[in-house]
């Protein structure tokens, strides 16, 4: 079929990727500048089919209530700085979602967020001692109210029957928990955001792959291809945001901005064990996070998770890591080699040598068969039966490799990195965890870095969207309590 070139269109804002990041930024800009035209480009035929899809992530509302990698122990002391920072960012997300419900942009809170207890689990003397220290430290902090702790086997089994039945308690176990954790369906949330965007005039072009992003004066020329017809079209945008998951790196590279020089990406695939037995699923209602093995990367932290997806309760365990050179679940086997540049190849090669813990972990994970996966599950659920669990593939995560700094030939980062040009006309988000949980916080950072000249004008409206904007809730318990009660009620999380 012959391809055709359509006439160039012009738009104020172009969002690449129909996932939670683009959807969140689009909603913010629509509220701040309702007259600005927006277009979303998505390679697939539906929104939220990659990392935002509910079975492609754990759906944890990451607020450091249970995730032990945010509270490392250093010289016998539990460090809380990361936990407080992550919690602060999630409070921003809660406020923004509540505001969007009040504004009618989002339609149904129960469709995308549900209250599920968050639990930290430790077994063996060392882990129990650590967990007790962690509880004693965090429970005193205003951002972690209502946290509880027990080492009692009976209380453990009452709260977590699946994990208690058949367990040998002689080695010692402990859990700390809070009832007010959340499970979030980021796929449903993305779809609600985009449905609201369409109502307010945003154009969404599904089945359109962005082939190139190049500067055109002070603007950006975006070349897209219809994946079904092969037709090529161009769009000129005043501002471009690349929220395309793993493909943000190659698209930023194509843009030619100097800020992306030296950056690379290391793709890691994931798998879950998903429970297929309804009777088993009914016996567990919590997100239970354990401790990563010594030397293992943060992504290896195992967890047994209640999920609420499309009104149905599910149960998963994992993640188990894998490796492919793809940057997206529906990506190409050539994604990684195509991303190599003279400015990043040394950093990417060096990471394999410098990150021996990650290399060892990936090799061990790749060698695991189903019996080995079930053995890992039985550390949490001792009586798990093989026939009750199926293996499903999760989303693709591309970890950030930062440029060479000092003596290190590049460094592997397990967080996110926002890249933008100095003019603030193009930005993209790299990396993975905590990802979707901090989307509103990350998109506010996009606004600050790319629209600095507008922030004074936008300030009052941003404060309406996020009442705590510009304030550290950790130092203002009164405001924290106010926004907590507001979000609990508006998001229908009150019991």
Describe the residue ranges of each PLM region.
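Helical element adjacent to the flavin cofactor pocket in flavoenzyme catalytic cores
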Residues: 173-239, 437-450
